[in-house]
UniProtKB/Swiss-Prot annotation:
Zn(2+) binds at residues 79, 238, 242. Catalyzes the hydrolysis of UDP-3-O-myristoyl-N-acetylglucosamine to form UDP-3-O-myristoylglucosamine and acetate, the committed step in lipid A biosynthesis. It comes from Shewanella amazonensis (strain ATCC BAA-1098 / SB2B). Belongs to the LpxC family. Keywords: Hydrolase, Lipid A biosynthesis, Lipid biosynthesis, Lipid metabolism, Metal-binding, Zinc. Pathway: Glycolipid biosynthesis; lipid IV(A) biosynthesis; lipid IV(A) from (3R)-3-hydroxytetradecanoyl-[acyl-carrier-protein] and UDP-N-acetyl-alpha-D-glucosamine: step 2/6. This is UDP-3-O-acyl-N-acetylglucosamine deacetylase. The active site is at 265 (proton donor). Signal peptide: none annotated. InterPro entries: Ribosomal_Su5_D2-typ_SF, UDP-acyl_GlcNac_deAcase, UDP-acyl_GlcNac_deAcase_C, UDP-acyl_N-AcGlcN_deAcase_N. It catalyses: a UDP-3-O-[(3R)-3-hydroxyacyl]-N-acetyl-alpha-D-glucosamine + H2O = a UDP-3-O-[(3R)-3-hydroxyacyl]-alpha-D-glucosamine + acetate. The lineage of its organism: Bacteria, Pseudomonadati, Pseudomonadota, Gammaproteobacteria, Alteromonadales. One of its GO terms (molecular function) is UDP-3-O-acyl-N-acetylglucosamine deacetylase activity.
Length: 306
């Protein structure tokens, strides 16, 4: 039987909020079977819990944000969720003392390290996978995203930026998912942005915590970060990282192929909602044997380092 997973121990870190620029403390705690991922705002009295569900994603400008019916929000969840998805964590309580998850270095790698430091605990209930039975597609102008049946989890992603540095890099990638491939090839890819946008963002109280410490920054011609890129194709890899996180609000690891062109947080969430709404397009499945599961996660205790 392939079992659900949580973290073995509580683990905590502190970072900066990308949009607020303020210090944020993040705590990850174990959770019982069938809890899912629950985020909690501990700076509010009483604390407010927000379950990580597709219909709770109500803001997708510059990041993915969960917002409850009372307007309480937790923003910038996508990199943490990519790490949770990449390591196959089904159940956890995520406490944060601010309206956003800390940006850390702009990638999922610090969250992978945090989860591996906490340890991964198998639980007593079977892990449920969301298996795609028919293709579901969403479009917005020339942008599109779809998910189709596939015996595994594959990502086929293309970006198209009219920028000389990005144009020089590979802008299309196909990846068959495994925990090892995610940690080594995707998790360290950082978010990126353009100098020309920063003034506008800061005038709107966004990206106040953004810097070359937590993003790849480009001017009109080149990457400005002194150390350059972590991967030659870091741009498309970061978009794949974002997609991993955005898709995980489906509540389960996906068995299918995610194909996308120029998609972002908004279209990713639209796709998840469209899939869940089309009840004939998917089914929940479990597996008795590791060898039978088409999606592979590293075994607990076997840390995979980038």
């Amino acid at each position: 039987m392939i079992f659900q997973r949580t973290v073995k121990e509580m683990v905590k870190t502190t970072g900066v909020g990308l949009h607020s620029g303020n210090k944020v403390t993040l705590t990850i705690k174990p959770a019982p079977i069938n809890t899912g991922i629950v985020l909690m705002r501990t700076d509010l009295n009483p604390a407010v819990a927000i379950p990580a569900k597709a219909n709770m994603v109500r803001e997708t400008t510059m990041c993915t944000a969960l917002v409850n019916d009372e307007g309480v929000r937790i923003s910038t969840i996508e990199h943490l969720f990519a790490a949770l998805a990449g390591l196959g964590i089904d159940n956890a309580v995520i406490e944060v003392d601010a309206p956003e998850i800390p940006i850390m270095d702009g990638s999922a790698s610090p969250f992978v390290f945090l989860l591996q430091s906490a340890g991964i605990q198998e639980q007593s209930a079977p892990k449920k996978y969301l298996r795609i039975k028919r293709t579901v597609r969403v479009e917005d102008g020339d942008k599109w995203a779809e998910i189709r049946p596939f015996q595994g989890f594959r990502v086929n992603f293309a970006i198209d930026f009219n920028h000389p540095e990005i144009a020089r890099s590979q802008q299309h990638m196909v990846m068959d998912f495994s925990s090892t491939a995610f940690v080594k090839d995707i998790s360290r890819a950082r978010t990126f942005g353009f100098m020309r946008d920063i003034e506008y963002l800061r005038a709107n109280n966004l990206a106040l915590g953004g810097s070359m410490e937590n993003a790849v920054v480009l001017d009109e011609y080149r990457v400005l970060n002194p150390d350059g890129l972590r991967y030659e194709d870091e741009f498309v890899k970061h978009k794949i990282l974002d997609a991993f996180g955005d898709l995980y609000v489906a509540g389960h690891a996906i068995i299918g192929e995610f194909c996308a062109y120029k998609t972002g947080h908004a279209l990713n969430n639209q796709l998840v909602r469209a899939v869940l709404a089309a009840q004939d397009a998917w089914e929940l499945v479990s597996f008795d044997k590791e060898a039978d599961a088409p999606v592979s996660f590293a075994m607990p205790g076997n840390a995979v380092f980038a």
